[in-house]
From Swiss-Prot:
Exhibits adenosine 5'-monophosphoramidase activity, hydrolyzing purine nucleotide phosphoramidates with a single phosphate group such as adenosine 5'monophosphoramidate (AMP-NH2) to yield AMP and NH2. Hydrolyzes adenosine 5'monophosphomorpholidate (AMP-morpholidate) and guanosine 5'monophosphomorpholidate (GMP-morpholidate). Hydrolyzes lysyl-AMP (AMP-N-epsilon-(N-alpha-acetyl lysine methyl ester)) generated by lysine tRNA ligase, as well as Met-AMP, His-AMP and Asp-AMP, lysyl-GMP (GMP-N-epsilon-(N-alpha-acetyl lysine methyl ester)) and AMP-N-alanine methyl ester. Its EC number is 3.9.1.-, 3.4.22.-. GO terms for biological process: intrinsic apoptotic signaling pathway by p53 class mediator; protein desumoylation; proteolysis; purine ribonucleotide catabolic process; regulation of DNA-templated transcription. Widely expressed. CDD domains: PKCI_related. One of its GO terms (molecular function) is adenosine 5'-monophosphoramidase activity. Belongs to the HINT family. One of its GO terms (cellular component) is histone deacetylase complex. This is Adenosine 5'-monophosphoramidase HINT1. It comes from the Eukaryota. Keywords: Acetylation, Apoptosis, Cytoplasm, Hydrolase, Nucleotide-binding, Nucleus, Phosphoprotein, Protease, Thiol protease, Transcription, Transcription regulation, Ubl conjugation pathway. It comes from Bos taurus. Residues 18-126 form the HIT domain. It is found in: Cytoplasm; Nucleus.
Length: 126
């Protein structure tokens, strides 16, 4: 977790990201789901027994940079997250998280929805 905080403190919006490379299939990922709008894949540093990301194929650096016309796309990410959670057997529940900016723990500046499950989640999360 400390490693992710350190990454978030130095990460900045702009430029190509690892997620862009995954979308273009330049680097491998354990893909769970793909359609014309988004991609879901397992996190390389899981924070729960099941931890995957859902990302839009359209580049949006962070939620605060989203436009009104991104509303449907952002909602689609949540629906895909729900469907993937069901497909992965997360019947007892799961958590969906979007990190925003350095204080929010955002380490990659390409909007992404974390879906975590497979254990009891703690509250408060941070």
């Amino acid at each position: 977790m400390a490693d992710e905080i350190a990454k978030a403190q130095v990460a900045r919006p702009g430029g190509d990201t690892i997620f862009g490379k995954i979308i273009r299939k330049e680097i491998p990922a354990k893909i769970i789901y793909e359609d014309d709008q988004c991609l879901a894949f397992h996190d390389i540093s899981p924070q729960a027994p099941t931890h995957f990301l859902v990302i839009p194929k359209k580049y949006i650096s962070q939620i605060s940079a989203a436009e009104d016309d991104d509303e449907s796309l952002l909602g689609h990410l949540m629906i895909v997250g729900k469907k993937c959670a069901a497909d992965l057997g997360l019947k007892k529940g799961y958590r969906m998280v979007v990190n925003e900016g350095s204080d929010g723990g955002q380490s990659v500046y390409h909007v992404h929805l974390h879906v975590l499950g497979g254990r009891q989640m703690n509250w408060p999360p941070g």
